[in-house]
A protein has these predicted regions:
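Amphipathic, alpha-helical segments enriched in basic
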Residues: 1-3, 11, 59, 63, ...
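Short N-terminal "domain-start" leader segments
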Residues: 1-50, 81-82, 89-90, 97, ...
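A short, exposed loop/beta-hairpin motif centered on an aromatic-Gly-Thr core
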Residues: 55-82, 86-93
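A short alpha-helix capping/helix-loop junction motif
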Residues: 96-102
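Post-kinase regulatory C-tail/linker adjacent to protein kinase catalytic domains
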Residues: 102-108
Length: 124
């Protein structure tokens, strides 16, 4: 299975512009699937990059967390990317086309709900 993974900035209007490169969304074939964030631990340790998936594959995801990794840590953003790809490929294989369709439908529902809320707020 060939997938297209893309990183995009999570915040376009971050209150601290110097933090813009610390928060990324992970898209798979154009659909949001997770986050990649620069994490600063204790001051005596270097920061690391932490990623995790936010998937909603319905019943097709039952047992996914026990069977595979849906999160990880890497020393650099570039080092995290191959791990994210491997984990995403395994996750998609586990949930199958039905699980992926359930996730895409869930994300479309969230987008529609957000848009409806935005329209309601603009009328008030």
């Amino acid at each position: 299975m060939t997938i297209s993974l893309t990183l995009r900035r999570t915040y376009n209007d971050h209150p601290r512009p110097e933090d813009d490169d610390k928060f990324w969304s992970i898209d798979c074939d154009g659909c949001y699937v997770g986050s990649l964030v620069l994490h600063q631990g204790p001051s005596d340790t270097p920061p690391d990059w932490r990623w995790n998936f936010h998937m909603h594959p319905g019943r097709h995801g039952n047992g996914a967390r026990e069977g595979m990794s849906d999160c990880g840590i890497a020393p650099t953003r570039d080092a995290a990317l191959p791990d994210i790809r491997r984990a995403m490929e395994r996750y998609l294989e586990f949930i199958g086309p039905e699980g992926w369709a359930a996730h895409v439908a869930h994300m479309e529902w969230l987008k529609a709900r957000k848009e409806a809320t935005r329209k309601r707020e603009n009328r008030a």
